[in-house]
Amino acid sequence: MIPKMDTEAYLDQLLGVGRFSSLKDGLYVLKLFSGVMVDIVMYMTVLRDGTVKTRVEVVNWGAIDNTVIHEETISRERACNIVRNQFYVASALTNVCRDFMEKAVGELSDIENSTVEGDIILDYQKVVSLGQFEVEVLYNSGGYECTLYPMYAEQQKFYTKDIDRVESFLSKMKKKYDATVKRVVEEELSKIGD
């Protein structure tokens, strides 16, 4: 059998396992993680020699550009094992989101108690997506309302006038979250062998 067709036959047998599906001949998609406005997806392209080129992207549904966080060419066996063991990656990413949400709640609670008053920007609006939750910041009658929207829990609201601290915190947290997600995806994929 031709190596490409052989690999496709193996992968076709796994269609429907978890969140693994086929887009077209030789192109497969594995949704590793579902977030509020952000998903983490692995695209698998079967090459002529039967190997599989993988590309993991953070798909941001609110923006046009996606971020590539991992690429490699792997064997057919390893591709099949990744599909079978996808839930380990999803579980690790869920733990990352939970940890970051706890940090966000703690920090926003601290900021809420701040007596510092920042600039007043009447039309201020900012939304930061961090996997399974989002933080929205709006100016509202003399202060800023920070609303945390988790996927699986009730929203939480925090009020502050210290917008500089909120912006600084959200910016640092987003960078740290992105770096952590990349590291965790690479670590979890490296654990899955042939």
Ranges and model annotations:
Residues 38-85, 133-171:
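Intrinsically disordered, low-complexity regulatory segments enriched in Ser/Thr/Pro
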Residues 18, 26, 72, 79, ...:
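Small side chains
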Residues 6, 33, 55, 128, ...:
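Residue-level detector of intrinsically disordered/flexible regions characterized by low predicted structural confidence
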Residues 4, 48, 70, 113, ...:
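Intrinsic disorder/low-complexity segments, especially N-terminal tails and targeting/processing regions
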Residues 1-37, 88-129, 189:
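Negatively charged, low-complexity tracts enriched in Asp/Glu with abundant Ser/Thr
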Residues 8-15, 76, 80, 84, ...:
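Residue-level detector of alpha-helical secondary structure
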Residues 17-22, 36-42, 52-58, 106-118, ...:
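Generic structural motif
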